[in-house]
């Protein structure tokens, strides 16, 4: 009960100062990670007795599913259709190059890892974190086209990483994952079923919520509970059919808007807050785990972490964005702000649950921890200054620059819209991809 009491007390204190904290460079993940690190010495006995990777996995999975669903439900579908080429580039060329380059660098930095173990490490660290990137995607100072692209990328790349991760685990273990016949079949199950589950739950759930609201069957408080049940339903059904719960949650969040347009403006706030609570709990637990393993963090882990956050992320993004006419400032901004956090923690726990005691297991675990830890601080502390610098850079661009083309027609946010969000009505201005 001591860790829970400390966490809840910190959560309450942080909520009292949250508006002030949002005006600083110290983010909530930094606060709760540091708190976990500071509390570890007093909780060592408790952690050894009761802290398990399986328990942390469930907390992290639920937190990430909630966050992905709420992010997707707040994504403007009109703008999404206009920027489809940017997320497609980041999720295809960008992600594949990130996994390949990450594996190559891992083999160079950690020669003791096999090729497949290097692939495991790369797949765990390939996805970006929607939670750590919230400051970016919620800032009206960042062009809509850029932040929506980063939001969609973060929402989908963790789910897309899962098949690669489990395939590398299967190859490293020299056997087929779960008896499935091929990588193609497994990808179809994870991604294809994930999309189908998300579409079914999102469309049906949105239609039923809208029907209940129009018929005045549903109370406002239970309208919120109805929305929060949808991402949890995505999680449960995905687990039952062997689909990616992360893909299902994000697709479900997009689909729910079709039948229930108010999902992203009002009711989703309940789901978002609970998702945020779970995310902060994960960072708190991660901070304790990081201190526990700190003596094992060698120089190679720090070198790989630095390369993973810079070269391994930024070079593939730059290649993927060739031909978009985006400025160098935008390419660098999108390349740098691909933080590693909750998604990598979840995938790391999936790996620890699935792994067959590979020789490089500890090397992979420590490298993931160091990379996430470095990202929490580096991306958190650089977010506000980075937005300010980027804002000045794009202000000097011509009016027809690709960065500006989706921000031509903007209105004041309607009642109920969260602070930092804007509403784009429609923009018929064409842009080059």
What are these regions (language model features)?
Residues 1-431:
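Transmembrane helical cores of multi-pass secondary ion antiporters/exchangers
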